[in-house]
């Protein structure tokens, strides 16, 4: 059994939506990123890669590679799943914490869970997504960006 932790941050930029956990959410900003900016799936990918001792998403999907410009993070996550399966691991469960003042996440949580479960090839009850604010403190509280912590448990397949 292995445990991995992932953390990612993206700054808000011009735009009218953000993508979190594979779900497109209307917002008065977008997220600045080389790929689609899905900070949930980036943190989750890092947690999975870390648990399997496979490095991080920067190693596998460098932001200097034009191939990944605007990339769909669900495609990247599915690639990560293939890597961990190839090393003899399967996902036991994942837990994701979104840290953001806005937008409200509650209406989107169940959709995120369903997409993540599908991409990880696991059951819905093995995926948790929750959100919190920082009570208007720090960069997330000032609505300058979004942060996500992810934890993943891997089990031998």
Curated annotation (Swiss-Prot):
This enzyme's EC code(s): 4.6.1.12
Gene Ontology biological process terms in this record: isopentenyl diphosphate biosynthetic process, methylerythritol 4-phosphate pathway; terpenoid biosynthetic process
UniProt-listed CDD domains: MECDP_synthase
Catalytic activity: 4-CDP-2-C-methyl-D-erythritol 2-phosphate = 2-C-methyl-D-erythritol 2,4-cyclic diphosphate + CMP
Matching PROSITE patterns: ISPF
Keywords on record: Isoprene biosynthesis, Lyase, Metal-binding
This protein's pathway: Isoprenoid biosynthesis; isopentenyl diphosphate biosynthesis via DXP pathway; isopentenyl diphosphate from 1-deoxy-D-xylulose 5-phosphate: step 4/6
Site features described as Transition state stabilizer, chain residue numbers: 34, 133
Residues holding a divalent metal cation: 8, 10, 42
Cofactor comment text: Binds 1 divalent metal cation per subunit.
Protein purpose: Involved in the biosynthesis of isopentenyl diphosphate (IPP) and dimethylallyl diphosphate (DMAPP), two major building blocks of isoprenoid compounds. Catalyzes the conversion of 4-diphosphocytidyl-2-C-methyl-D-erythritol 2-phosphate (CDP-ME2P) to 2-C-methyl-D-erythritol 2,4-cyclodiphosphate (ME-CPP) with a corresponding release of cytidine 5-monophosphate (CMP).
Record text on subunit structure and interactions: Homotrimer.
Name of protein: 2-C-methyl-D-erythritol 2,4-cyclodiphosphate synthase
Species annotation: Pseudomonas fluorescens (strain SBW25)
Encoding gene, per UniProt annotation: ispF
